[in-house]
Amino acid sequence: MFIAHAAQARDRGAELYLVSVAKTAKGIREGNEHYPQVARTLGIPVLMANCVGPADTFIGAGGSAAWDSQGNLLAALDGPQEGIILLDTKNSSAVGVPLSMPSA
């Protein structure tokens, strides 16, 4: 995929690669293979934020995730669940916090 972009960011001093994506279920499967490799290869944590639900002509699959600098998965949100991932780069830990919508 796009490791050159991440490498350029790291070479310019980035200590975290933050990726905002709009991926389908297929794209998330590919991202879950690619981004841990980016983390391992470049030695920096990766935080991937995906959209959830209808987006233009497709359905965003959710599945936002964070990996440490060795490519270990630290946290991920389940599929189409809205939420936020809190990544602590100092302690190499993360937590996925689901968000629930208020009932109408």
Language-model regions, residue ranges each:
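Active-site beta-loop-alpha substructure in enzyme catalytic cores
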Residues: 1-42, 48
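C-terminal beta-strand edge segments of enzyme domains
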Residues: 37-38, 51-104
